[in-house]
Design a protein with these regions (language model features):
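PAS/PAC or PAS-like capping segment
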Residues: 1-2, 54-55, 178
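Conserved helix-loop-beta segment at the catalytic/binding core of cyclic-nucleotide signaling proteins
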Residues: 16, 34, 38, 77-108, ...
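Hydrophobic framework residues that shape the active-site pocket
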Residues: 53, 57, 76, 98, ...
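Short helix/loop segment flanking the catalytic signature motif in cyclic-nucleotide metabolism enzymes
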Residues: 72, 99-119, 131-132, 140
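Alpha-helical scaffold within the catalytic cores of cyclic-nucleotide enzymes
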Residues: 76-81, 109-127, 156
Length: 193
């Protein structure tokens, strides 16, 4: 392998991967999701987007320090990546948010993947010699039935995630149109307060 080839690989890794966790980044996510949407339209089938936000991550970051928050993010990333069906389909969106794309090949594993993620977050994480719990909330949207563009799917997954957070956190909510209208009303009320 030549130096030029190694340099090219390094540039691609920097462009596509999150520097902290090694997961793919938001830019790569948008490219991959667009490709998955096209595949499901062309060949049929269904996919799903799982939008994960860590609950009360700020408390760990502020209480233990950012270096331990970073360690937790790395540990969570590594653990998510080890779940069968997730592997290279996990992306760090920034901060404490992650997205998993399940293409039509993985959609049959949706319930098992959700259970594996719940199990992962039901256990403590070892930080600074002690156990700390960090739960997650998740919004799930299916494609192309509930959306067929990157922007629409992110918006709907975020709405489902918001519903999970508002329902007490540490939950998984599937997108539904009734949730969307309720979320928009709640956002309008909060904005006008």
């Amino acid at each position: 392998v030549t130096d030029k080839k190694l340099y090219q690989q390094k540039i691609e890794r920097q462009a596509n991967n999150d520097f902290l966790t090694g997961l793919y980044n938001r830019m790569r996510f948008e490219q991959d999701l667009a490709h998955c949407i096209e595949q499901t339209k062309e060949f049929g089938g269904e996919g799903a987007l799982l939008y994960i936000d860590l609950d009360d991550f700020k408390h760990i970051n502020d209480g233990l320090g950012h270096q331990y928050g970073d360690i937790l993010l790395k540990n969570i990333s590594d653990s998510l990546r080890r779940i069968p069906g997730v592997e290279n389909n996990c992306y760090r969106m920034g901060g404490d948010e992650f997205i998993i794309i399940l293409a039509h090949r993985q959609i049959m594993m949706l319930q098992k993947i959700l259970n594996d993620i719940r199990t992962l977050f039901s256990k403590p994480w070892m930080l600074k010699g002690a156990d700390y719990y960090c739960t997650m909330s998740m919004g799930v949207v299916r494609f192309p039935t509930e959306g067929d563009t990157v922007e629409e799917l992110i918006k709907k997954a975020d709405i489902a995630l918001y519903a999970a957070k508002c329902s007490g956190k540490n939950r998984v909510e599937f997108y539904d149109e009734n949730v969307e209208s309720t979320s928009f009303r709640r956002l309008d009320m909060e904005k006008n307060m």
